[in-house]
């Protein structure tokens, strides 16, 4: 069979493996990669072995170092980018900093153990940071001979999903053996195919960035003599046509204006797309009316807020974080998109303090409003140095 041509026409979906550290996430990831490479050879489906996935390269996201592996593969229906964070701490950091946004995830539970404390923690976190869908791979199923035990473990996992408002009743639960599938055992290779069919069917197709309402964080502001004020930045989502109305949101009262010109690399464009760096010429806007940290958005799509609840990972001393704990009423800077705003932290009831290396929930009140929505990431900084990173879980005001 000749090499299949890489088709950009397939829907692209971001997924990941989550679950307890010894339940075989990385082995399963390697097995998916091998089985799909054998069954559907293509430019994308290149087998990745365990070692290459496990020795995850370090990435920096909002000032935090995370080990994370990216594996790419495709089924006949979809193209997938799959993230695997080998260590428990890496997984927690990845989820909270949004280093890899997931459209859905495979919860890996060893049939030999059932759900463990880390399994529960990962499911809770997936809910908090807004992973839309979970399905289950019961790994190491080859090591359990008793059907009843498998049924009990499945029941327990379904209850765990339901307890965090995932669809525990209907989520696919597939018995797999990553190790046996890697060894080429036909029965278990088939189960990996079955798992990927379940992923294709059950993880909803995400709304792509370009189909969402337009948003561009302002990075810089210039005056072009005779033409007016230009704001530059990278469009985060949506598309924007020339002569569209937009709002400038955050930090000061919201203002409406019209985009009379769009430029990219000194070329005039008719529209700006998600992912592009561009300059927008704003009608009748003075240079001092706009500043870095505001966002340019489709009118009515985003509102500014000062109070929110979030979940955050606080860097350990070894990671370059604080050397000592912080208490309630701590006032660091919160870095959203392109700017720092001071905020006051209130800790959850019963929590005296937060130690470096901890994960915590918090309530925050900012001194200036910021354009935000649930799921938005932020860094916590002190004098320009990152001491933590988190995600907005709920907007209060």
Curated annotation (Swiss-Prot):
Its EC number is 3.6.5.3. It comes from Clavibacter sepedonicus. InterPro entries: EF-Tu_GTP-bd, EF-Tu_GTPase, EFTu-like_2, EFTU_2, G_TR_CS, P-loop_NTPase, Small_GTP-bd, T_Tr_GTP-bd_dom. HAMAP family: EF_Tu_B. The gene is tuf. Mg(2+) binds at residue 26. Belongs to the TRAFAC class translation factor GTPase superfamily. Classic translation factor GTPase family. EF-Tu/EF-1A subfamily. It catalyses: GTP + H2O = GDP + phosphate + H(+). GO terms for molecular function: GTP binding; GTPase activity; translation elongation factor activity. Keywords: Cytoplasm, Elongation factor, GTP-binding, Hydrolase, Magnesium, Metal-binding, Nucleotide-binding, Protein biosynthesis. Residues 139-142 are annotated as: G4. GTP binds at residues 19-26, 84-88, 139-142. CDD domains: EF_Tu (cd01884), EFTU_II (cd03697), EFTU_III (cd03707). Monomer. GTP hydrolase that promotes the GTP-dependent binding of aminoacyl-tRNA to the A-site of ribosomes during protein biosynthesis. It is found in: Cytoplasm. Residues 19-26 are annotated as: G1. This is Elongation factor Tu. Residues 84-87 are annotated as: G3. Residues 10-207 form the tr-type G domain.
């Amino acid at each position: 069979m000749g090499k299949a041509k890489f088709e950009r026409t397939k829907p692209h979906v971001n997924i990941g493996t989550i679950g307890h550290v010894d339940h075989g996430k990385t082995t399963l990831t390697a097995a998916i990669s091998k089985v799909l490479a054998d069954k559907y050879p293509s430019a994308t489906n290149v087998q990745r072995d365990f070692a290459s996935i496990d020795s995850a390269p370090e990435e920096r996201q909002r000032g935090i170092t995370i080990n994370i592996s990216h594996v790419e593969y495709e089924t006949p229906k979809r193209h997938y980018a799959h993230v695997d964070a080998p260590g428990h701490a890496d997984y927690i950091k990845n989820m909270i900093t949004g280093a890899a946004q997931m459209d859905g995830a495979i919860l890996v539970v060893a049939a030999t153990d059932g759900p463990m404390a880390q399994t529960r923690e990962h499911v809770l976190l997936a809910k908090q940071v807004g992973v839309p869908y979970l399905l289950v791979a019961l790994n190491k199923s080859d090591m359990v001979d008793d059907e009843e035990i498998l049924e009990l473990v499945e029941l327990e996992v379904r209850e765990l999903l339901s307890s965090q408002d995932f669809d525990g009743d209907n989520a696919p639960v597939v018995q797999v053996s990553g190790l046996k599938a890697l060894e080429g055992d036909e029965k278990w290779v088939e189960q990996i195919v079955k798992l990927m069919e379940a992923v294709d069917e059950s993880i909803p197709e995400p709304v792509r960035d370009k189909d969402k309402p337009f948003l561009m964080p302002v990075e810089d502001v210039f005056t072009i003599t005779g033409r007016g004020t230009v704001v530059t930045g990278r469009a985060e989502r949506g598309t924007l046509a020339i002569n569209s109305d937009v709002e400038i949101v955050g930090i000061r009262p919201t203002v409406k204006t019209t985009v009379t010109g769009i430029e990219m690399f000194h070329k005039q464009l008719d529209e700006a797309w998600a992912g592009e760096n561009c300059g927008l010429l704003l009608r009748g806007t003075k240079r001092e009316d706009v500043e870095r940290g505001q966002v340019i958005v489709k009118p009515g799509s985003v509102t500014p807020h000062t109070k929110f609840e979030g979940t955050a990972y606080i860097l350990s001393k070894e990671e370059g974080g604080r050397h000592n704990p912080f208490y309630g009423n701590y006032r660091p800077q919160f870095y959203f998109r392109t700017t720092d705003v001071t905020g006051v932290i209130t800790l959850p009831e019963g929590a005296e303090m937060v130690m470096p290396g901890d994960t915590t929930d918090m309530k925050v009140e900012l001194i200036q409003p910021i354009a935000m929505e649930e799921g938005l990431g932020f860094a916590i900084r002190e004098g320009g140095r990152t001491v933590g990173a988190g995600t907005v879980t709920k907007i209060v005001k």
